[in-house]
């Protein structure tokens, strides 16, 4: 990740198997949460520069308000889960993991 103070911009370099599906992958891999946290920490916009692993095509993806709001919602849920487990001591861990023998 690069923080460009003169341009007030955070640049995150990512790779993908398919640049045409990067937008959905960004939600799947919680890049919306990352973008929200970084934008709050540094008070700067964030862009993703994406390289397709197969074609080497480049993509530049900025973050919409909707994308950042999605990240904010996910972060709020994570904070609530943390508080439930570690602050309040009343969380139910069983909903967050699976335990099996291989």
Over which residues does each language-model region extend?
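Short, glycine/acidic-rich beta->alpha junctions
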Residues: 29-33
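Metal-dependent nuclease catalytic regions and adjoining charged, substrate-binding loops involved
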Residues: 24-27, 37-102
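Conserved catalytic cores of phosphodiester-cleaving nucleases, focusing on short active-site segments
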Residues: 1-23, 38
């Amino acid at each position: 990740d690069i923080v460009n103070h003169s341009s007030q911009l955070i640049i995150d370099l990512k790779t993908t198997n398919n640049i045409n599906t990067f937008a959905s992958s960004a939600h799947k891999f919680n890049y919306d949460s990352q973008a929200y946290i970084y934008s709050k920490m540094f008070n700067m916009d964030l862009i993703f520069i994406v390289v397709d692993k197969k074609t080497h095509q480049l993509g530049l993806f900025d973050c919409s308000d909707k994308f950042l709001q999605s990240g904010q919602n996910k972060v709020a849920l994570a904070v609530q889960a943390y508080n439930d487990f570690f602050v309040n001591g009343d969380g139910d861990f069983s909903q967050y993991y699976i335990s099996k023998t291989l």
